[in-house]
Amino acid sequence: MKKINVITLGCSKNTVDSEHLMARLAAAGYEVLFDSDRTDAKVVVINTCGFIGDAKQESIDMILRAAAAKQAGKIERLFVVGCLSERYADELRAEIPEVDDYFGARTWDGIVRALGASEDPALATERRLTTPKHYAYLKISEGCNWKCGYCAIPLIRGAHVSVPMEELEEEARKLAGQGVRELMVIAQDTTYYGIDLYGRRMLAELLRRLCRIDGIEWIRLHYAYPAGFPDEVIEAMASEPKICKYLDIPFQHISDAQLASMHRRHTKAEACLLYTSDAADEED
């Protein structure tokens, strides 16, 4: 059985992408590893980050390390996927030709075909978990519609695309069946969830549905954009014991002038109103 090592760099969204890829590779007969300290597998896939300077450098360093291992005969095939290669594919091909091929953050079918893995849609909700067994990330959407002045995510990941609720419920059930007890709900902007599919923000409804899944005991919300934050989410947190009283919100700044220069879509007053919402006060 041929070993393949999937090295994941960057954020938790990348982790989910890698876990889906690993499930398809395992179904194709690969022995799948996920160890960033090893470059001795016959095939290596590096899932990169291209967001900030330090992350880009970390990705480049890992690619160069693996390329050197390939030149030394330790690796037979080397592939690079993810945000860095989505953003800089031409430059990377020119500078690091040892890589067999580069695939972006939106071309997962390409790497699946290159490695002979299954393209069966039924595997779309399968995961080879790399997190501690009691929790897993649940990515509810891809991309972002906001155009913040400092952020390249819309360029890299494209427009916001929500995953249908039924698919997320099925994925959560499978995760619960694998022993997962806590869901970390993630996206580029979790609070925007549903607008493209249902015509309105549906995060609160999704959270309530996830609460009904047997085996899931805690649900923790991450990447909640403050602009347009739905009051229904606070109400769901107050009434549903499985939803952790926790919010990961990137306020970024509290100066209206600075927020405007960053092209953020909320003000100081709106941020303060969210922080002091009636539902939150009632829960306290």
Residue ranges and their predicted role:
Residues 1-193, 232, 243, 247, ...:
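Proteins enriched for Cys/Gly/acidic motifs involved in redox and nucleic-acid/cofactor modification
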Residues 50, 157-158, 197-200, 260-266:
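Short glycine-enriched, charge-decorated loop/helix-capping segments at active-site entrances
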Residues 189-193, 217, 226-229, 242-268:
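Conserved radical SAM core fold
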Residues 197-199, 230-240:
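Distinct, well-ordered alpha-helical segments
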